């Protein structure tokens, strides 16, 4: 038996530096002019039924045939402002640099048009850079959007530091526990989950601090070399 796990590197200065940077961001006070937003994305396989499922009835769960039809793949984008209890999720056919850039444009012009700066926490996927903005928009617009971002990357093998990844896990359990074979249907389900979750304004109160990390995760820090 085995489990797949994200194992951080031991005694790694780059990991420790990025981890402490993100932890410091999470402990900033709430500031609507500089909201802290986390983002993540995940691939999703659209699946259809070969045979109609048998509905649940007293004493018997719903039954699905183990054979299915692949209906393509897509990517689910998730944006979370932990201190406000706000989420935005939607699925797109692709996850290219241009797709990410248009997601950022929506974030800055629709979700946060009045924020001076959006503090963005995400992993260091190659599409997650301001260079992607220049592939999607003219230089003036790309520069203007980039100037409103303050980007902080989680360390490699440190996905547990991304609140948006935690939210995607919750979304998967609560909303994606059955087969969906159409992008429009998937987006309708995501919109319903988003509306319900946002109406509850469930905030994320991050307790783990840099002081905690230096004690509980001290094996991740390199040995200090002093002259």
Language model region names:
Residues 115-129:
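Acidic/histidine-rich, metal-coordinating catalytic segments
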Residues 19-105, 217:
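Extended, low-complexity cationic-aromatic segments
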Residues 63-68, 141-163, 180-181:
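RNase H-like polynucleotidyl transferase catalytic core
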Residues 87, 164-183, 196-200:
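Active-site proximal helix-loop segment of RNase H-like, two-metal nucleases, encompassing DDE(D)
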Residues 74, 123-124, 151-173, 184, ...:
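RNase H-like two-metal-ion nuclease catalytic core shared by retroviral integrases
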Residues 11, 50, 185-227:
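C-terminal domain-tail junction helix/linker
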Residues 98-119:
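Short, basic/hydrophobic alpha-helical segments
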Residues 38-40, 79, 85, 104, ...:
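Mobile genetic element proteins and their domesticated derivatives, centered on retroelements
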């Amino acid at each position: 038996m085995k489990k797949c796990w994200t194992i951080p590197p031991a005694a790694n200065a780059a990991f420790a530096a990025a981890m402490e940077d993100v932890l410091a961001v999470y402990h900033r006070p709430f500031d609507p002019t500089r909201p802290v937003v986390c983002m993540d994305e995940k691939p999703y396989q659209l699946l259809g039924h070969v045979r109609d499922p048998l509905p649940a009835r007293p004493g018997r769960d719903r039954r699905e045939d183990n054979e299915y039809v692949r209906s393509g793949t897509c990517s689910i984008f998730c944006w979370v402002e932990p201190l406000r209890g706000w989420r935005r999720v939607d699925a797109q056919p692709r996850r290219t640099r241009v797709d990410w850039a248009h997601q950022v444009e929506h974030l800055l012009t629709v979700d946060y048009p009045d924020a001076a700066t959006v503090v963005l926490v995400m992993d260091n996927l190659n599409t997650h850079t301001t260079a992607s903005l220049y592939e999607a928009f003219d230089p003036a617009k790309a520069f203007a959007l980039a100037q409103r971002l303050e980007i902080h990357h989680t360390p490699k093998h440190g996905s547990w530091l991304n609140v948006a990844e935690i939210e995607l896990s919750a979304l998967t359990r609560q909303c994606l526990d059955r087969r969906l074979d159409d992008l429009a249907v998937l987006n309708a389900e995501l919109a319903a989950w988003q509306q319900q979750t946002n109406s509850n304004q469930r905030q994320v109160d991050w307790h783990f601090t840099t002081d905690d990390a230096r004690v509980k995760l001290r094996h991740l820090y390199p040995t200090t070399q002093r002259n």
